[in-house]
Protein backbone atom coordinates (compact mmCIF):
# COMPACT_ATOMS: atom_id res chain seq x y z
CA UNK A 1 0.00 0.00 0.00
CA UNK A 2 2.82 2.42 0.76
CA UNK A 3 4.05 2.14 -2.83
CA UNK A 4 0.61 2.98 -4.20
CA UNK A 5 0.33 5.94 -1.83
CA UNK A 6 3.75 7.34 -2.66
CA UNK A 7 3.11 6.93 -6.39
CA UNK A 8 -0.14 8.85 -6.07
CA UNK A 9 1.44 11.64 -4.06
CA UNK A 10 4.33 11.90 -6.50
CA UNK A 11 1.87 12.07 -9.37
CA UNK A 12 0.12 14.99 -7.71
CA UNK A 13 3.39 16.73 -6.90
CA UNK A 14 4.78 16.51 -10.41
CA UNK A 15 1.43 17.12 -12.09
CA UNK A 16 1.90 14.00 -14.18
CA UNK A 17 -1.79 13.66 -14.81
CA UNK A 18 -3.53 13.85 -18.18
CA UNK A 19 -6.87 15.45 -18.96
CA UNK A 20 -10.05 13.65 -18.08
CA UNK A 21 -11.31 11.14 -20.57
CA UNK A 22 -14.06 9.31 -18.77
CA UNK A 23 -16.41 11.38 -16.63
CA UNK A 24 -19.77 10.14 -15.42
CA UNK A 25 -22.48 12.19 -17.09
CA UNK A 26 -24.83 11.06 -14.32
CA UNK A 27 -24.61 8.91 -11.22
CA UNK A 28 -26.15 5.86 -12.85
CA UNK A 29 -28.03 4.91 -9.66
CA UNK A 30 -31.65 3.81 -9.92
CA UNK A 31 -32.30 3.16 -6.22
CA UNK A 32 -30.53 2.78 -2.91
CA UNK A 33 -29.51 4.37 0.37
CA UNK A 34 -26.18 6.19 0.59
CA UNK A 35 -24.90 7.72 3.82
CA UNK A 36 -21.49 9.34 4.23
CA UNK A 37 -19.39 9.86 7.37
CA UNK A 38 -16.43 12.20 7.05
CA UNK A 39 -14.25 14.86 8.58
CA UNK A 40 -15.38 18.47 8.28
CA UNK A 41 -13.39 20.76 5.97
CA UNK A 42 -13.97 22.44 2.58
CA UNK A 43 -12.59 19.73 0.29
CA UNK A 44 -14.84 17.12 1.89
CA UNK A 45 -17.80 19.50 1.74
CA UNK A 46 -17.27 19.61 -2.02
CA UNK A 47 -17.24 15.81 -2.23
CA UNK A 48 -20.39 15.41 -0.14
CA UNK A 49 -22.20 18.16 -2.04
CA UNK A 50 -21.51 16.41 -5.33
CA UNK A 51 -22.72 13.12 -3.84
CA UNK A 52 -25.99 14.80 -2.91
CA UNK A 53 -26.64 15.62 -6.56
CA UNK A 54 -27.29 11.89 -7.03
CA UNK A 55 -30.34 11.98 -4.75
CA UNK A 56 -33.76 11.30 -6.27
CA UNK A 57 -37.14 10.00 -5.20
CA UNK A 58 -35.61 6.50 -5.18
CA UNK A 59 -32.07 7.36 -4.03
CA UNK A 60 -31.35 8.88 -0.62
CA UNK A 61 -28.00 10.53 0.05
CA UNK A 62 -27.20 11.77 3.56
CA UNK A 63 -24.01 12.97 5.25
CA UNK A 64 -22.49 13.51 8.68
CA UNK A 65 -19.42 15.72 8.45
CA UNK A 66 -17.85 16.13 11.87
CA UNK A 67 -14.40 16.47 13.43
CA UNK A 68 -15.45 13.55 15.68
CA UNK A 69 -15.68 11.14 12.74
CA UNK A 70 -12.80 8.98 14.04
CA UNK A 71 -14.62 8.36 17.30
CA UNK A 72 -17.84 7.40 15.51
CA UNK A 73 -16.72 5.24 12.61
CA UNK A 74 -16.04 1.83 14.18
CA UNK A 75 -19.27 1.60 16.18
CA UNK A 76 -21.29 3.01 13.28
CA UNK A 77 -19.92 0.50 10.78
CA UNK A 78 -20.24 -2.43 13.22
CA UNK A 79 -24.02 -2.00 13.14
CA UNK A 80 -25.88 -4.29 10.74
CA UNK A 81 -26.78 -2.68 8.47
CA UNK A 82 -24.00 -0.14 8.91
CA UNK A 83 -25.13 3.34 9.94
CA UNK A 84 -23.01 4.80 7.13
CA UNK A 85 -22.53 3.18 3.75
CA UNK A 86 -19.25 5.05 3.14
CA UNK A 87 -16.66 6.31 5.59
CA UNK A 88 -14.29 8.86 4.11
CA UNK A 89 -10.96 7.90 5.64
CA UNK A 90 -7.32 8.89 5.69
CA UNK A 91 -4.04 7.02 5.86
CA UNK A 92 -4.51 6.35 9.57
CA UNK A 93 -8.26 6.30 10.11
CA UNK A 94 -8.80 3.38 7.72
CA UNK A 95 -6.64 1.10 9.89
CA UNK A 96 -9.20 0.47 12.69
CA UNK A 97 -11.82 -0.33 10.04
CA UNK A 98 -9.46 -2.82 8.40
CA UNK A 99 -8.56 -4.37 11.75
CA UNK A 100 -12.27 -4.93 12.48
CA UNK A 101 -13.14 -6.10 8.95
CA UNK A 102 -15.72 -3.33 8.50
CA UNK A 103 -15.04 -2.28 4.89
CA UNK A 104 -15.52 -4.46 1.83
CA UNK A 105 -13.09 -5.19 -1.00
CA UNK A 106 -13.96 -3.11 -4.04
CA UNK A 107 -12.31 -5.07 -6.86
CA UNK A 108 -15.57 -6.28 -8.44
CA UNK A 109 -17.14 -2.83 -8.27
CA UNK A 110 -13.99 -1.20 -9.66
CA UNK A 111 -14.08 -3.63 -12.59
CA UNK A 112 -17.75 -2.85 -13.32
CA UNK A 113 -18.07 0.84 -12.54
CA UNK A 114 -14.59 2.27 -11.92
CA UNK A 115 -13.38 3.04 -15.44
CA UNK A 116 -12.85 6.71 -14.53
CA UNK A 117 -10.56 5.88 -11.60
CA UNK A 118 -6.78 6.04 -12.01
CA UNK A 119 -4.67 3.07 -10.88
CA UNK A 120 -2.85 5.39 -8.46
CA UNK A 121 -6.12 6.00 -6.61
CA UNK A 122 -6.67 2.36 -5.72
CA UNK A 123 -5.48 1.64 -2.18
CA UNK A 124 -4.72 -2.05 -1.89
CA UNK A 125 -4.33 -4.15 1.24
CA UNK A 126 -3.11 -7.71 0.75
CA UNK A 127 -3.78 -7.32 -2.95
CA UNK A 128 -7.41 -6.18 -2.58
CA UNK A 129 -8.75 -2.69 -3.30
CA UNK A 130 -10.08 -1.44 0.04
CA UNK A 131 -10.34 2.31 -0.61
CA UNK A 132 -10.28 4.88 -3.39
CA UNK A 133 -7.97 7.84 -2.71
CA UNK A 134 -8.98 11.24 -4.07
CA UNK A 135 -6.71 13.80 -2.39
CA UNK A 136 -3.25 14.18 -0.85
CA UNK A 137 -2.57 16.09 2.32
CA UNK A 138 0.14 17.00 4.79
CA UNK A 139 0.82 19.61 7.39
CA UNK A 140 3.19 22.36 6.31
CA UNK A 141 4.33 25.88 7.14
CA UNK A 142 2.26 29.02 6.63
CA UNK A 143 4.07 32.31 7.28
CA UNK A 144 3.32 36.04 7.11
CA UNK A 145 5.78 37.67 4.73
CA UNK A 146 4.94 41.18 5.96
CA UNK A 147 5.60 40.30 9.61
CA UNK A 148 8.94 38.68 8.75
CA UNK A 149 10.00 41.78 6.81
CA UNK A 150 8.94 44.01 9.71
CA UNK A 151 11.06 41.90 12.06
CA UNK A 152 13.98 41.76 9.64
CA UNK A 153 14.12 37.96 9.48
CA UNK A 154 14.28 35.53 6.56
CA UNK A 155 11.73 32.77 5.88
CA UNK A 156 12.90 29.72 7.85
CA UNK A 157 13.73 26.33 6.39
CA UNK A 158 14.60 24.64 9.71
CA UNK A 159 12.83 24.67 13.05
CA UNK A 160 15.84 26.29 14.73
CA UNK A 161 15.52 29.16 12.26
CA UNK A 162 11.77 29.37 12.83
CA UNK A 163 12.18 29.47 16.61
CA UNK A 164 14.88 32.15 16.34
CA UNK A 165 12.69 34.24 14.01
CA UNK A 166 9.69 33.92 16.33
CA UNK A 167 11.81 35.11 19.27
CA UNK A 168 12.81 38.22 17.30
CA UNK A 169 9.15 38.91 16.51
CA UNK A 170 8.28 38.58 20.21
CA UNK A 171 11.29 40.59 21.44
CA UNK A 172 10.47 43.46 19.08
CA UNK A 173 6.92 43.57 20.43
CA UNK A 174 5.35 42.75 17.08
CA UNK A 175 3.47 39.68 18.35
CA UNK A 176 3.53 38.12 21.81
CA UNK A 177 2.70 34.57 20.67
CA UNK A 178 3.79 34.32 17.02
CA UNK A 179 3.49 30.52 16.55
CA UNK A 180 0.47 28.21 16.35
CA UNK A 181 0.37 24.45 15.82
CA UNK A 182 -2.36 21.82 16.17
CA UNK A 183 -1.27 20.79 19.68
CA UNK A 184 -4.60 19.89 21.25
CA UNK A 185 -4.19 17.04 23.73
CA UNK A 186 -5.07 13.79 22.00
CA UNK A 187 -4.81 12.97 18.31
CA UNK A 188 -3.45 16.38 17.27
CA UNK A 189 -0.63 16.41 19.82
CA UNK A 190 0.30 12.86 18.91
CA UNK A 191 0.49 13.85 15.24
CA UNK A 192 2.80 16.78 16.01
CA UNK A 193 5.27 14.44 17.71
CA UNK A 194 5.03 11.96 14.84
CA UNK A 195 5.78 14.75 12.37
CA UNK A 196 8.87 15.81 14.35
CA UNK A 197 10.09 12.26 14.82
CA UNK A 198 9.80 11.59 11.09
CA UNK A 199 12.25 14.44 10.48
CA UNK A 200 14.89 12.62 12.56
CA UNK A 201 14.78 9.67 10.15
CA UNK A 202 14.09 7.33 13.06
CA UNK A 203 11.81 4.30 12.97
CA UNK A 204 8.83 4.15 15.31
CA UNK A 205 9.23 0.41 15.89
CA UNK A 206 12.14 -1.97 16.27
CA UNK A 207 12.85 -3.95 13.12
CA UNK A 208 9.71 -5.57 11.74
CA UNK A 209 8.17 -5.92 15.19
CA UNK A 210 5.52 -3.97 17.10
CA UNK A 211 8.06 -3.06 19.81
CA UNK A 212 8.12 0.76 20.27
CA UNK A 213 11.27 2.68 19.43
CA UNK A 214 10.71 6.31 20.45
CA UNK A 215 12.41 6.61 23.87
CA UNK A 216 15.79 7.53 22.43
CA UNK A 217 17.82 10.67 21.56
CA UNK A 218 15.75 11.21 18.41
CA UNK A 219 12.54 11.16 20.42
CA UNK A 220 14.02 13.59 22.94
CA UNK A 221 15.07 15.96 20.14
CA UNK A 222 11.60 15.83 18.63
CA UNK A 223 9.99 16.59 21.99
CA UNK A 224 12.40 19.40 22.85
CA UNK A 225 11.72 21.05 19.49
CA UNK A 226 7.99 20.78 20.04
CA UNK A 227 8.33 22.32 23.51
CA UNK A 228 10.38 25.23 22.17
CA UNK A 229 7.60 25.94 19.67
CA UNK A 230 4.84 25.81 22.28
CA UNK A 231 6.78 28.28 24.43
CA UNK A 232 6.26 30.79 21.62
CA UNK A 233 2.59 29.91 21.27
CA UNK A 234 -0.46 31.00 23.22
CA UNK A 235 -0.54 29.47 26.74
CA UNK A 236 -3.71 27.54 25.87
CA UNK A 237 -1.95 25.68 23.04
CA UNK A 238 -3.18 22.33 24.37
CA UNK A 239 -6.64 23.30 23.07
CA UNK A 240 -5.51 24.10 19.51
CA UNK A 241 -7.03 22.00 16.73
CA UNK A 242 -7.25 22.87 13.03
CA UNK A 243 -10.24 25.16 13.46
CA UNK A 244 -8.60 27.15 16.26
CA UNK A 245 -5.30 27.47 14.42
CA UNK A 246 -7.02 28.65 11.24
CA UNK A 247 -9.00 31.20 13.24
CA UNK A 248 -5.83 32.56 14.86
CA UNK A 249 -4.28 32.90 11.42
CA UNK A 250 -7.24 34.66 9.86
CA UNK A 251 -7.45 36.99 12.87
CA UNK A 252 -3.84 38.05 12.27
CA UNK A 253 -2.60 36.83 15.64
CA UNK A 254 0.29 34.61 14.48
CA UNK A 255 3.20 34.89 12.06
CA UNK A 256 3.91 31.16 11.74
CA UNK A 257 1.52 28.22 11.72
CA UNK A 258 1.82 24.57 10.81
CA UNK A 259 -1.54 23.59 9.37
CA UNK A 260 -2.98 20.99 7.03
CA UNK A 261 -2.65 21.74 3.35
CA UNK A 262 -6.40 21.19 3.01
CA UNK A 263 -6.83 24.46 4.95
CA UNK A 264 -4.92 26.38 2.29
CA UNK A 265 -7.87 27.34 0.11
CA UNK A 266 -9.85 28.67 3.09
CA UNK A 267 -6.81 30.63 4.29
CA UNK A 268 -6.26 32.19 0.86
CA UNK A 269 -9.87 33.03 0.02
CA UNK A 270 -11.46 36.43 0.65
CA UNK A 271 -13.61 35.29 3.57
CA UNK A 272 -12.91 35.40 7.29
CA UNK A 273 -9.75 37.50 7.14
CA UNK A 274 -8.35 40.88 6.12
CA UNK A 275 -6.96 41.47 2.60
CA UNK A 276 -3.49 42.38 3.90
CA UNK A 277 -3.25 39.12 5.84
CA UNK A 278 -4.29 37.06 2.81
CA UNK A 279 -1.91 38.96 0.52
CA UNK A 280 1.09 38.33 2.76
CA UNK A 281 0.37 34.65 3.51
CA UNK A 282 2.91 32.21 2.09
CA UNK A 283 2.60 28.42 1.96
CA UNK A 284 5.86 26.45 1.91
CA UNK A 285 7.36 23.10 2.85
CA UNK A 286 7.42 22.07 6.47
CA UNK A 287 10.75 22.98 8.12
CA UNK A 288 13.32 20.28 8.82
CA UNK A 289 15.29 19.74 12.01
CA UNK A 290 18.57 20.40 10.23
CA UNK A 291 19.67 22.00 6.98
CA UNK A 292 18.78 19.77 4.05
CA UNK A 293 16.99 17.31 6.30
CA UNK A 294 13.61 15.65 5.94
CA UNK A 295 10.53 17.87 6.41
CA UNK A 296 8.94 17.43 9.84
CA UNK A 297 5.64 16.18 8.50
CA UNK A 298 3.90 13.09 7.17
CA UNK A 299 2.21 12.52 3.82
CA UNK A 300 -1.41 11.42 3.81
CA UNK A 301 -4.13 10.43 1.40
CA UNK A 302 -7.86 10.84 1.91
CA UNK A 303 -10.21 8.39 0.27
CA UNK A 304 -13.56 6.66 0.48
CA UNK A 305 -14.61 3.16 1.45
CA UNK A 306 -17.76 1.07 1.16
CA UNK A 307 -19.03 -0.52 4.36
CA UNK A 308 -19.14 -4.30 4.65
CA UNK A 309 -22.44 -4.54 6.54
CA UNK A 310 -24.64 -3.44 3.64
CA UNK A 311 -26.84 -5.09 1.07
CA UNK A 312 -25.09 -5.60 -2.24
CA UNK A 313 -27.56 -3.17 -3.82
CA UNK A 314 -26.71 -0.37 -1.38
CA UNK A 315 -23.00 -1.13 -1.72
CA UNK A 316 -23.27 -0.76 -5.50
CA UNK A 317 -25.28 2.45 -5.16
CA UNK A 318 -22.71 3.83 -2.72
CA UNK A 319 -19.82 3.00 -5.04
CA UNK A 320 -21.47 4.73 -7.99
CA UNK A 321 -22.35 7.81 -5.94
CA UNK A 322 -18.83 8.10 -4.53
CA UNK A 323 -17.30 7.79 -8.01
CA UNK A 324 -19.50 10.73 -9.01
CA UNK A 325 -18.64 12.58 -5.78
CA UNK A 326 -14.92 12.38 -6.55
CA UNK A 327 -15.16 12.84 -10.31
CA UNK A 328 -13.24 15.20 -12.55
CA UNK A 329 -16.43 17.27 -12.71
CA UNK A 330 -16.32 17.84 -8.94
CA UNK A 331 -12.57 18.48 -8.96
CA UNK A 332 -12.74 21.12 -11.70
CA UNK A 333 -15.41 23.02 -9.78
CA UNK A 334 -13.32 22.88 -6.60
CA UNK A 335 -9.75 22.69 -7.87
CA UNK A 336 -8.44 25.15 -5.28
CA UNK A 337 -9.66 23.17 -2.27
CA UNK A 338 -7.16 20.29 -2.22
CA UNK A 339 -4.26 18.53 -3.86
CA UNK A 340 -6.55 16.23 -5.78
CA UNK A 341 -5.44 12.78 -6.95
CA UNK A 342 -8.10 12.98 -9.65
CA UNK A 343 -7.53 12.92 -13.39
CA UNK A 344 -7.01 16.40 -14.81
CA UNK A 345 -5.85 18.15 -11.63
CA UNK A 346 -3.56 21.19 -12.01
CA UNK A 347 -2.04 22.57 -8.76
CA UNK A 348 -2.57 26.16 -7.61
CA UNK A 349 -1.15 28.37 -4.85
CA UNK A 350 -3.09 26.57 -2.11
CA UNK A 351 -1.33 23.30 -3.02
CA UNK A 352 2.22 24.68 -2.87
CA UNK A 353 3.04 23.70 0.71
CA UNK A 354 1.96 20.08 0.24
CA UNK A 355 3.77 19.74 -3.07
CA UNK A 356 6.96 21.33 -1.67
CA UNK A 357 6.89 18.87 1.24
CA UNK A 358 6.46 15.94 -1.16
CA UNK A 359 9.36 17.14 -3.30
CA UNK A 360 11.52 17.52 -0.18
CA UNK A 361 10.96 13.81 0.49
CA UNK A 362 8.57 13.96 3.43
CA UNK A 363 7.78 10.48 4.75
CA UNK A 364 4.35 8.84 4.47
CA UNK A 365 2.43 8.28 7.69
CA UNK A 366 3.14 4.67 8.76
CA UNK A 367 0.27 2.41 7.71
CA UNK A 368 0.74 -0.25 10.35
CA UNK A 369 -2.07 -1.94 12.31
CA UNK A 370 -0.53 -0.88 15.63
CA UNK A 371 0.41 2.70 14.67
CA UNK A 372 -2.94 3.98 15.90
CA UNK A 373 -2.22 2.66 19.38
CA UNK A 374 1.14 4.45 19.47
CA UNK A 375 -0.47 7.63 18.12
CA UNK A 376 -3.10 7.54 20.89
CA UNK A 377 -0.48 6.92 23.57
CA UNK A 378 1.59 9.87 22.38
CA UNK A 379 -1.45 12.12 22.35
CA UNK A 380 -2.31 11.34 25.95
CA UNK A 381 1.17 11.16 27.53
CA UNK A 382 3.19 14.11 26.19
CA UNK A 383 1.36 17.11 27.64
CA UNK A 384 2.99 16.78 31.09
CA UNK A 385 6.42 17.30 29.53
CA UNK A 386 5.25 20.31 27.54
CA UNK A 387 3.93 21.83 30.77
CA UNK A 388 7.22 21.24 32.58
CA UNK A 389 5.89 18.52 34.88
CA UNK A 390 8.30 15.77 33.80
CA UNK A 391 11.35 15.13 31.64
CA UNK A 392 11.27 14.24 27.96
CA UNK A 393 12.65 10.81 28.77
CA UNK A 394 9.89 10.16 31.32
CA UNK A 395 7.19 11.32 28.91
CA UNK A 396 8.49 8.98 26.22
CA UNK A 397 8.75 6.15 28.74
CA UNK A 398 5.13 6.77 29.74
CA UNK A 399 4.05 6.81 26.09
CA UNK A 400 5.82 3.53 25.38
CA UNK A 401 4.23 1.96 28.47
CA UNK A 402 0.74 3.11 27.48
CA UNK A 403 1.28 1.86 23.93
CA UNK A 404 2.62 -1.50 25.14
CA UNK A 405 -0.43 -2.08 27.33
CA UNK A 406 -2.76 -1.30 24.41
CA UNK A 407 -0.75 -3.37 21.92
CA UNK A 408 -0.79 -6.39 24.25
CA UNK A 409 -4.53 -6.04 24.75
CA UNK A 410 -5.01 -6.08 20.97
CA UNK A 411 -2.62 -8.96 20.40
CA UNK A 412 0.12 -7.01 18.60
CA UNK A 413 2.68 -7.82 21.31
Where are these regions (language model features)?
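A structural signal for short loop-to-beta-strand junctions that line the ligand-binding cleft
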Residues: 75, 83-85, 113-148, 177, ...
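Hinge/lid segment of periplasmic solute-binding proteins
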Residues: 91-138, 154, 163, 192, ...
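Conserved C-terminal helix/tail region of periplasmic/extracytoplasmic solute-binding proteins
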Residues: 28-33, 58, 149, 332, ...
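Glycine-centered hinge/linker elements that transmit conformational signals in sensory
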Residues: 166, 209-238
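Short, solvent-exposed loop/beta-turn-alpha elements that line the ligand-binding surface or hinge
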Residues: 104-120, 179-184, 200-221, 270-281, ...
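Extracytoplasmic/periplasmic solute-binding protein
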Residues: 130, 139, 163-211
Amino acid sequence: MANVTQWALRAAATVAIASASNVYASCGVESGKVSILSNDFPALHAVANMAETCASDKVTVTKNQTKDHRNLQVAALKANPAKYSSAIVSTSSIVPLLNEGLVRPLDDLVAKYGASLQPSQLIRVDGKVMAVAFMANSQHLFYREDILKLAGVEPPTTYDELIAAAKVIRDKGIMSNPIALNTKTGWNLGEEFINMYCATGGDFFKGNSAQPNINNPMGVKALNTLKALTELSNPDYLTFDSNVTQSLWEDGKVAFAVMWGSRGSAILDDEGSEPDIVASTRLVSTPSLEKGGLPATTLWWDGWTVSKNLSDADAEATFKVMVKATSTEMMKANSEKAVWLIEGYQPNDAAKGVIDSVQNKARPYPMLPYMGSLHSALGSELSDFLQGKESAEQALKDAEAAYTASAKEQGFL
